[in-house]
A protein has these predicted regions:
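Short linear motifs at protein or domain termini
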Residues: 1-110, 116, 120
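Conserved amphipathic alpha-helical segments that form helical-bundle/coiled-coil interaction surfaces
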Residues: 103-174
C-alpha cells in the first residue's frame, strides 16, 4: 500500500483514523453498520485494503465484523483505550478534552510510584541527572521564550526527564 498526501501515512491508516474519529464524534453511532463495499466506495480503496481496515478497527475493539453485515460500530467502552492509535484518534476528535483529562489522571496515578521506585533503584549517576533536567526546564520556563521553539525545547526535556524516571523505575509496564 502506498502512502498518501498525509505525510506518508498508509491509506488504510488514514481510513481507520477517519472512521474512528467519526465513531468518536457520534457521526457513526454504536450499533450502526457499514458494509465493506460502503467503505471501498467511499474511500476509493480495494477490497483488500477495506478488509485490513476492518481487521485493524476490530483489533482495537472499535467495530465487530459480521459476515453479510460488515463493520458494526461498538461503544467506546469496548475500545482498547490504552492503544496509542486510539489515544491519538481521541485527541483529534471531539473527545480531545476528555482524553487529555484521562491521560492526566493516569499520569497522576503512575508517576509518583515510578519516581519513588526510580529514587530507590537508579544509580547515583542517573540520580544526578534528575536535578539537571529540572533546572533546564525551569530555565526555559523562566526565560519566557515565546513561540514554538520554547515550547518544543521544554516539551523535549520533559519527555526525556519522564522517560528516564519511568525507565529507571524498574517496572517494565511504566
Amino acid at each position: 500500500m502506498a502512502g498518501n498526501e498525509n505525510g506518508g501515512e498508509l491509506l488504510q491508516d488514514a481510513v481507520c483514523r477517519t472512521l474512528a474519529i467519526e465513531m468518536l464524534d457520534g457521526k457513526w453511532p454504536a450499533g450502526e453498520s457499514l458494509t465493506l463495499e460502503d467503505v471501498q466506495n467511499r474511500f476509493g480503496i480495494s477490497r483488500t485494503v477495506a478488509r485490513e481496515v476492518a481487521k485493524t478497527l476490530e483489533s482495537m475493539g472499535a467495530v465487530t465484523v459480521r459476515r453479510r453485515v460488515g463493520l458494526v460500530a461498538r461503544p467506546f467502552s469496548d475500545w482498547q483505550a490504552l492503544n496509542h492509535q486510539v489515544i491519538e484518534w481521541r485527541l483529534h476528535s471531539t473527545q480531545r478534552e476528555r482524553q487529555l483529562s484521562s491521560l492526566t489522571e493516569l499520569r497522576l496515578a503512575v508517576e509518583p510510584a515510578a519516581a519513588a521506585s526510580a529514587a530507590r533503584l537508579a544509580s547515583i549517576d542517573v540520580k544526578a541527572k534528575f536535578p539537571v533536567y529540572a533546572a533546564q526546564m525551569r530555565q526555559i520556563a523562566e526565560s519566557n521564550e515565546e513561540g514554538a521553539a520554547g515550547l518544543t525545547k521544554f516539551h523535549d526535556l520533559d519527555v526525556e526527564f519522564h522517560t528516564l524516571i519511568l525507565r529507571e523505575s524498574g517496572n517494565e509496564l511504566f
